[in-house]
Amino acid sequence: MEAVVTDRPYKIGGNVLNNGYIENLPSEACVEVPCYIDARGVHPVKVGRLPEQLAAMNRTNINPQLLAIEAAVTKDRSKIYQAAMLDPHTAGVLSIDEIVRMCDELIDAHGEYMKDYK
């Protein structure tokens, strides 16, 4: 707020929609990049390309997140299963059948909020 009010730029690590700030990650992903804040708003800084091993590591988290967003937009239950199956931690400890069962239990537990998911 101080940077906005005083127009003295302040640098933070901000979470923003990628929009090409990190070239080798999906543009629709949320990424953390350096940002300058001033009276005119938040100004993300282009980072360029990450070393491929780091980009690959990031994509293991980004891919299930993008599928979860698609599931929310389309109300497609199978996309929820797919997102959970691609999650590195979930896939590391549960079988496919256990993942489907867990997702079904969570969807059922949220009742009215998730009633449209087919």
Annotate each PLM feature.
Residues 1-118:
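Long, compositionally biased stretches enriched for glycine and/or charged residues
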